[in-house]
Amino acid sequence: MVWPWVAMASRWGPLIGLAPCCLWLLGAVLLMDASARPANHSSTRERVANREENEILPPDHLNGVKLEMDGHLNRGFHQEVFLGKDLGGFDEDAEPRRSRRKLMVIFSKVDVNTDRKISAKEMQRWIMEKTAEHFQEAMEESKTHFRAVDPDGDGHVSWDEYKVKFLASKGHSEKEVADAIRLNEELKVDEETQEVLENLKDRWYQADSPPADLLLTEEEFLSFLHPEHSRGMLRFMVKEIVRDLDQDGDKQLSVPEFISLPVGTVENQQGQDIDDNWVKDRKKEFEELIDSNHDGIVTAEELESYMDPMNEYNALNEAKQMIAVADENQNHHLEPEEVLKYSEFFTGSKLVDYARSVHEEF
């Protein structure tokens, strides 16, 4: 009796003998095909370009500032001024007990007189301290970014030097851009990039302190990236926001103008809820915090005062607002149980078993 696999081997024997040769040939063909195809470096180049662009472009979001550059409310503001440098330390994936302990350590630092309650004055002092941390962080980042756009290291950056680096981050050849600028030739850029360049140039000129020389020092470059560090640049940022929101051209803002929905239509109930929250939150912010004289109109001066992160009066108002959110027993102070219960407001993460954990951490 011949086993089936023996019979099969005898029938396919000649072909089986060719198998190693065929495999070798197939491998050679695949290798040639792989080597003939150009390597895909586009994603790598894109990541590098994005990193370079992020290093030299003014950020849309400024930690510790109430409004974004586009006039939207800073949704993370309360967490930023409560956590400071610990902003990234309360991830959803973090171990809950460790997060609760960390939150109670912060509570103890805010509670200067150790009476296990946080007053508005204590919270005000803490907000100012955390805002200063964000300022220091921005200064350190700006120093690094300044070196990236100051290739000759002379301590000054011209608009043309910055323009070369910016367009290089957009994928243009640095040498070709530099040559075109030197020869006063027209640069071919798309409409969107041209618009960004024009806005950046306006901002560059504003950051150039008198006497204007169109060269930015390291300090002026900091103001260019972070307008909250300069009174003049903060005023310029406010002017830009008012210009974007002001619908009747009177250079001030009414409630309807400030709460106007962003461009876009509501397509579903979730979108409607988001838009309803947008209106409610902005109306409350306008009436309770920005419109200081409560006349229904916000001037550029009122908006500038509201956005100034180092304004102690604003810090006190924010402290009172933050306490009011969690002050369940209405004693105008924050207690450990309240901070833990409203941990999502203070840290962005919801910490469970807050009442029991008070005894654990203390």
UniProtKB/Swiss-Prot annotation:
It comes from the Eukaryota. Ubiquitous. Isoform 5 is expressed in pancreas. GO terms for biological process: calcium-ion regulated exocytosis; cerebellum development; fat cell differentiation; maintenance of synapse structure; response to ethanol; UV protection; zymogen granule exocytosis. The modification Phosphothreonine is found at T193, T217, T265, T299. Ca(2+) 4 binds at D246, D248, D250, Q252, E257. Residues 1-36 form the signal peptide. Ca(2+) 2 binds at D150, D152, D154, H156, E161. InterPro entries: CAB45_EFh, EF-hand-dom_pair, EF_Hand_1_Ca_BS, EF_hand_dom. PROSITE patterns: EF_HAND_1, EF_HAND_2. The modification Phosphoserine is found at S99. Isoform 5 interacts with STXBP1; the interaction is enhanced in presence of calcium. Isoform 5 interacts with STX3. Keywords: Calcium, Cell membrane, Cell projection, Cytoplasm, Exocytosis, Glycoprotein, Golgi apparatus, Membrane, Metal-binding, Phosphoprotein, Repeat, Signal. Glycans are attached at N40. Ca(2+) 6 binds at D327, N329, N331, H333, E338. This is 45 kDa calcium-binding protein. Ca(2+) 5 binds at D291, N293, D295, E302.
